[in-house]
Amino acid sequence: MRTLYIDTSSSYLYSAIVEDNNILGEIKEEYGQSLSEVALPRIVSIFNDNNIKPEDIDKIIVVNGPGSFTGIRIGITIAKVYSWSLNIPITTITSLEAMSLSSETAKYHVPAIDARRGYVFAAIYDKNNRQILKPQHIKIEDLKQEMSSLDDYVVITNDEYLDEDFDNIEAYNPNLLKIVNYYKDKEPINPHAINPDYLKLTEAEESKMN
């Protein structure tokens, strides 16, 4: 079984093609604001470098948020086009769960993404990936309160701005093989039903409400 994984929910592109228990090709690169321009060509390069055709993919897993609003849309669009045009089953995973799955260093995992203005996108999972606190847009101080009862935790993030707010920081380094193997048997979703899960309103939506 060959699975294509796509995560463009941050300034990084994380993508891989996994066959059974082997990574055939992967990308873990930071592109910043140029991600929208390079995401598709770099994903195509994984196919080309490994002599794999898109129609050889059996499953697609795409991160649907939270994170960068623009980035999330890019990854979802690419994944949906592959899925719909080639009739490839597709499913989603949250960026926070992917972050949690990639850590092995503590009893509790607290993936956190800077959401500005004193907020983060965050969740809490135990080491067996059982959800303790559901993914949400939460004040940093409120998250600290939720964490106060945890006896052994790590905060997983790639946002250096959060280093001042939390102890026990671990830089996010995605374990793409583990993520894919954990989710490859998840029930597929109609590609037309897949939408970004921002966990908060966009700034444009917030402006309309004010």
Kindly give the residue locations of the regions a language model identified.
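Oxyanion-binding and handling regions
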Residues: 1-22, 91-210
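N-terminal beta-alpha supersecondary unit
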Residues: 1-62
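Conserved short-loop catalytic and cofactor-binding motifs
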Residues: 27, 66, 187
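Residues at secondary-structure transition points
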Residues: 30-38, 69, 73, 77, ...
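A general structural signal for well-ordered alpha-helical segments in protein cores
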Residues: 36, 40, 75, 79, ...
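Buried hydrophobic packing segments
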Residues: 43, 78-82, 100
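DPxDG-like acidic metal-binding loop motif
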Residues: 59-90, 95
